[in-house]
């Protein structure tokens, strides 16, 4: 029954400043969106005192670019935790789909939890 908080969805709109010289969303923007949805998911499910006490940092990104979109396109990102945490580390997956449901970008990241005080 606890799987509900394991998944989180957010929509992004490709803005003019997100677009590269090829007319598509820049690769670095997808990484930024990964960090934005990860932060939103953490804030949505974590206790406030944990949000205040800890910060997550990325130690690894594995990214498959399968498609892309242009300016004004709406992209739906779904993030989920595929396994159990390993101590203060865990993997997070983020899948980005276009309006038609086509998988555009698939990301698997490793995150480490740090104490904000340190």
Regions picked out by a protein language model, each given a short descriptive name:
Residues 2-60, 114-118:
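Hot-dog-fold acyl-thioester-processing enzymes
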Residues 59, 76-77:
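Short Pro/Gly-enriched beta-strand edge/turn motifs at strand-loop
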Residues 23-30, 77-85:
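Short charge-dense sequence patches
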Residues 4-10, 65-74, 81-118:
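HotDog/MaoC-like acyl-thioester-processing domains
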């Amino acid at each position: 029954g606890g799987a509900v908080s394991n998944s989180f969805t957010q929509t992004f709109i490709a803005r003019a400043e997100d677009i590269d010289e090829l007319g598509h969303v820049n690769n670095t923007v997808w990484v930024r969106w990964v960090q934005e949805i990860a932060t939103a998911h953490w804030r949505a499910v974590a206790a406030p005192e944990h949000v205040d006490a800890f910060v997550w940092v990325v130690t690894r990104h594995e990214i498959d670019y399968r498609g892309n979109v242009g300016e004004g396109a709406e992209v739906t990102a779904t993030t989920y935790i595929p396994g159990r945490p390993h101590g203060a580390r865990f993997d997070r997956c983020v899948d980005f789909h276009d309006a038609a449901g086509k998988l555009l970008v698939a990301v698997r990241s490793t995150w480490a939890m740090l104490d904000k005080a340190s």
